[in-house]
Amino acid sequence: VAVMGGEPEAMFRRAISELGGMKQFVKPGQKVVVKPNIGWDKVPELAGNTNPQLIAEIVKQCFAAGAKEVTVFDHTCDDWQKCYKNSGIEAAAKAAGAKVMPAHLESYSKPVNLPNGQKMKKAKIHEAILNCDVWINVPILKNHGGANLTISMKNHMGIVWDRGFFHQNDLQQCIADICTLQKKAVLNVVDAYRIMKTNGPRGRSASDVVLAKGLFISPDIVAVDTAAAKFFNQVREMPLDTVGHLAKGEALKIGTMNIDKLNVKRIKM
């Protein structure tokens, strides 16, 4: 589902209703993780991190569907306490009733095998992901210096302890490899309310940001990232073959890039 032209909460409410409501993905009594991008010490207007209003709405919907608890975390790049605070996500998540958990220590992560990985055969994954019943992946759509675009697949780097391995060993392949994790997100929600078009993933100034008012959601991670990447191309040219992890993900059978054959609902608000 692709929604355009609304505020983050309203777009998500519309999108999730098109997929049959959050109860399709979250069952009563479940422990849920909502995994935003909180990587950077940036305010929401600079589009470095997932929109906090969107995160709050998703958390509320999880509880409305009967979730027992909802946990929010990310393995940040900048100082984690500053990221959690200045992104607005910690306050928004807590106000909606979620627990907010850190990820800055290796002890939070446990080793997991990735038998289908090509370059990466194992990774240390955050215990919140390993211990939850279901998780929801909520990236922001951004330009990225290394991966060209960072969306849902790339957002998996925030559940992993050793990010350095990715950058030293074929980043695009490792992004696809981590998405072969057996415990896949039940839903991917791409925040394209504000898009960082240049100088990502950190960004330099407000001139890097475009108010695009988009949202994409799907259980298929490759499809949702392909749709978001095509949307990014309306703002700045970025051939999909330069975002190599999409095709590599399709090759590993974690989703499809052929979004024309899917029933994509496009909604203007």
Segments the model singles out, each with a brief description of its role:
Residues 1-269:
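N-terminal and secondary-structure boundary signal
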